[in-house]
Regions:
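Short, functionally important secondary-structure microenvironments
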Residues: 1-237
Length: 237
């Protein structure tokens, strides 16, 4: 029932060639495809295992809630989800919105097909019995993302004449701010949505990195501070 680490080690070979080819046309290299699918699989696999643990060991529910409150329900994450941050049709925007789908502030209209992605993941969680089955759902999500990523743009090297495909307009600069010329960096002029200060944007970037490390197993799910333990006990009672 728990993660199949042998399957995860061979992830690169499990991804069908067509996905590499489609992603290349969008400007993504092979190593980027592996990384993206891995992140999506981590999220789906976490949801699968959470459901398994909640079902078979309900006493752990408060423990898990305490951990997720710490990494997935911080104030800066809540505010960012309500803002216009991470609303470009690029990888950074989609993964931020996807890994925070369970947050009550999640805006399913922030990106194309986000509502469809949520339904795809959560309508299947209860029936997933293995890492491979979770992988197939992650691939289905990646298929949707590829349909929404902008087409890549061919660029020719002036010296060598070599042609490469780079990511098209609408990609993120790494901080979730759109670079597609929409004239709005942080949503301050977009329907009264909350703005993030420069300091909050740095906090947000740090919070997202911690979320990804958490899903990747780099942050121990066993290490709880006394404060976290108290929060867990409060939820359990």
């Amino acid at each position: 029932k728990l993660s199949d680490f042998d399957f995860l080690k061979g992830l690169e070979n499990h991804i069908p060639t067509e996905y590499y080819n489609r992603a290349e046309a969008k400007g993504y290299q092979k190593y980027e495809v592996v990384s993206m699918v891995k992140d999506l699989l981590n999220y789906v696999e976490d949801r699968r295992i959470d459901y398994f643990v909640f079902t078979h060991s309900p006493g752990y529910k408060g423990y898990y809630h305490s951990l997720y409150d710490k990494y997935f329900h911080s104030k800066v994450i809540d505010k960012a989800l309500k803002s216009s941050e991470y609303t470009s049709s690029d990888w950074d925007s989609y993964i931020f919105r996807i890994i925070n789908l369970t947050n009550k502030n999640s805006d399913l209209d922030a990106l194309p097909d986000l509502r469809k992605i949520r339904k795809l993941i959560f309508s299947n969680v209860k029936s997933l019995n293995s890492t491979e089955e979770a992988f197939n759902i992650a691939l289905d999500v990646f298929h949707i993302l590829l349909e929404n990523f902008p087409d890549g743009v061919e660029k020719e090297d002036e010296e060598t004449g070599e042609v490469s495909v780079q990511k098209g307009d609408g990609d993120s600069d790494g901080n979730g701010e759109s670079v597609d010329g929409d004239g709005s960096e942080d949503g301050g002029s977009d329907g009264g949505k909350p703005e993030l200060t420069d300091n909050q944007k740095k906090q947000l970037e740090n919070a997202i990195n911690k979320q990804k490390k958490f899903m990747d197993g780099d942050i121990s799910k066993k290490a709880l501070s006394k404060k976290d333990k108290a929060s867990m006990d409060a939820v359990e009672s």
